[in-house]
Structure formats: structure tokens, C-alpha cells
Amino acid sequence: MFGSDLYIALVLGVTLSLIFTERTGILPAGLVVPGYLALVFNQPVFMLVVLFISILTYVIVTYGVSRFMILYGRRKFAATLITGICLKLLFDYCYPVMPFEIFEFRGIGVIVPGLIANTIQRQGLPLTIGTTILLSGATFAIMNIYYLF
């Protein structure tokens, strides 16, 4: 998926996330995350790496950084994003297996683990991961139907 497919997947993911959030009150790890993960839904290794970094970010911020700093609101969100970005960059540096097709998604992919970790802090792990995978799969399925026509 290149070019306009990126925009279509992100807009579709945001739309599905917004509808789902309005209906259920459950936020699927931020509005842009399901659209982004739908772009790599057929690459389970990449999805697992993003989820692993997200959980690691949550653990570091909740049980590490918050012991030394008072974190709430914007400070907590900023700490989560910075930790997620640093872990993603460190992981990319230490484990540089990145297929060419998803290279262009690295920019937005740096933010996604922090967004997922921030939502895990608010809603819990099972609810966040479950709804995110559900909506990513729905976005992926709709994009595949879009490709047929």
C-alpha cells in the first residue's frame, strides 16, 4: 500500500474508530492506530513488534519513570510518547529487519507504540489490544474489498 492507499486506510481507520468509540465508549488505542496497523495487518511480525514495544513502554513509564517523576495528564502522555519513540528507534537500530514495503511507514510507526501504551494506561491491556486488533482487522478487510473494485 503506497501513496493514496495510506491516506484511505488512515481515514477509514479514524472513521471506524470514531464510530466504535461513540457506540461503545471504548477507545481503540487512539483514532489513527487501527488505520496504521491495517496497513501492516498481513505482516504479523511487524504487528507483534509494535505491540511488544507498546507493552514495554507501558511498563517502563508506569513502573519506572513514574517512580522518579510526578506524571499526570500531558506530562504522562509526553513521557509515554518519548519512551515509545526511544524504544522504537532503539529496536530499529538493534534489529534492522525492515521489509522495503513498510519503510515509508516508519515515521508514523514511531508514534504508534506510545499511543497504544497511553491507552493501555487508561483502559487496561486486554480491552485496548482487543479493540485495536478488531478495528485494524476490520479496516484491513474493507481495504481488501476496496482493492477488488
From Swiss-Prot:
One of its GO terms (cellular component) is plasma membrane. GO terms for biological process: capsule polysaccharide biosynthetic process. It comes from Bacillus anthracis. The chain crosses the membrane at residues 1-21, 24-44, 45-65, 129-149. Essential for the synthesis of the polyglutamate capsule of B.anthracis which is one of the principal virulence factors during anthrax infection. May form a polyglutamyl synthetase complex together with proteins CapA and CapB. CapC may be the endogenous acceptor of glutamyl residues. Induction: Capsule synthesis is transcriptionally regulated by AtxA, AcpA and AcpB. Keywords: Capsule biogenesis/degradation, Cell membrane, Membrane, Plasmid, Transmembrane, Transmembrane helix, Virulence. InterPro entries: Capsule_biosynth_CapC. This is Capsule biosynthesis protein CapC. It is a multi-pass membrane protein. The gene is capC. Its main location: membrane. It is found in: Cell membrane. It comes from the Bacteria. Pathway: Capsule biogenesis; capsule polysaccharide biosynthesis.
